[in-house]
Design a protein with these regions (language model features):
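Short, conserved catalytic/metal-binding motifs centered on acidic residues
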Residues: 55-56, 70, 91, 95, ...
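Anion-binding and metal-coordination hotspots
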Residues: 45-52, 63-75, 81, 85-88, ...
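An internal, acidic/charged active-site-proximal segment
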Residues: 187-282
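Short, contiguous clusters of charged residues that form electrostatic/catalytic patches at enzyme active sites
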Residues: 53, 167-170, 202-209
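Short alpha-helical segments and helix-capping/turn motifs at coil-helix boundaries
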Residues: 54-57, 117-124, 231
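A general structural motif
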Residues: 129-132, 167, 180, 214-219, ...
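Active-site-proximal, Lys/Arg-enriched surface segment
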Residues: 96-178
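Gly/serine-rich nucleotide phosphate-binding loop at the start of the catalytic core
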Residues: 1-4, 14-90, 96
Length: 282
């Protein structure tokens, strides 16, 4: 995250960091150039697509919480964005209109190409933990409302009995040493008729297979919580050539008791294995 202290030194540091970031995005990852190539389905195009998407991307990276606050007073943003945007800064209505029309598949492809560059530049050549590239996988809720919904929303009953609509996805990203990179995200799908909405395990298996196909090899070890202690999920990881570390919380489970018994007998205390040129002990 870039510094944003309300001091002269903080402002200067923010400007320098932002300028360096933008230079790197343009020269190495070609992100501004790719943004200009996105499809634009708007009827009125008084503000160029780039002048809308680029500020949105920057404010997401700066972790600003509310687009409405930012784009309601675009004049105040012009000086901050003068290094990357020429021309008008959009208002919130223009941002909302464009984002509702952009094809998510095009954004996903830009992200996938960015991962390709990271791999080609061997960003993770030293690994993220102990020489291995470790990636965590978990579910995250993105949005919820009792009033607004779309055909792709999941649904549930809240505490008052009202139907609540929400979006949830499974995300896979590196853990350990920086940079922390999101490899991919898989949206969970709503139920069809009497069927239940998709769970995190179904989405996780689909995401792992997709990442294996698109970015193989993308990681050495997958880290997950107890939800993913599931034979079909573990078998999916094995099929994709991945090791796994899964947290086990319930001490009453037979698996936990068996492991504890082995440690008491001094079995399984240490085991080493090789993967390619790497060696690891557990």
């Amino acid at each position: 995250m870039l510094p944003h202290k309300h001091t002269k030194e903080g402002v200067l540091n923010e400007k320098l960091a932002l300028k360096k970031l933008l230079t790197y995005m343009k020269s190495v990852y070609k992100i501004p150039q790719k943004i200009k190539g996105l499809s634009d389905e708007r009827k009125r195009k008084s503000i160029p697509l780039f002048n809308i998407v680029m500020p949105v991307l920057i404010f997401l990276m700066l972790q600003y919480e509310g687009f409405h606050t930012i784009f309601s007073a675009p004049e105040s943003m012009e000086k901050r964005l003068k290094n990357c945007i020429r021309g008008k800064i959009p208002r919130v209505d223009a941002v909302r209109d464009l984002l509702s029309r952009i094809d998510p598949k095009e954004i996903e492809e830009i992200h996938a190409q960015t991962i390709d560059v990271l791999k080609r530049n061997r960003v993770f050549r030293e690994g993220t933990i102990g020489g291995y590239v470790a990636a965590g996988i978990d579910g995250v809720e993105l949005f919820s409302s009792t009033k607004k919904s779309c055909p792709d929303c999941l649904s549930r009953k809240n505490g008052t009995g009202k139907t609540e609509y929400f979006h949830r996805s499974v995300v896979c990203m590196t853990v350990g040493k920086s940079p922390h990179v999101i490899f991919g995200q898989e949206m969970l799908k709503p139920r069809d008729g009497s069927e239940k909405d998709e769970g995190g395990l179904t989405g996780a298996k689909r995401l792992i297979r997709h990442l294996k196909k698109r970015h193989s090899p993308f990681a050495d070890v997958i880290v997950a919580d107890a939800l993913y202690l599931n034979a079909p999920f573990i078998n999916t990881l094995k099929e994709c050539g991945l090791e796994t570390v899964i947290r086990l919380k319930d001490e009453r489970r037979l698996l936990f008791q068996d492991a504890e018994s082995m440690f008491q007998r001094d079995e399984g205390r240490k085991r080493s294995f090789r993967k390619g040129k790497k060696s690891i002990e557990v």
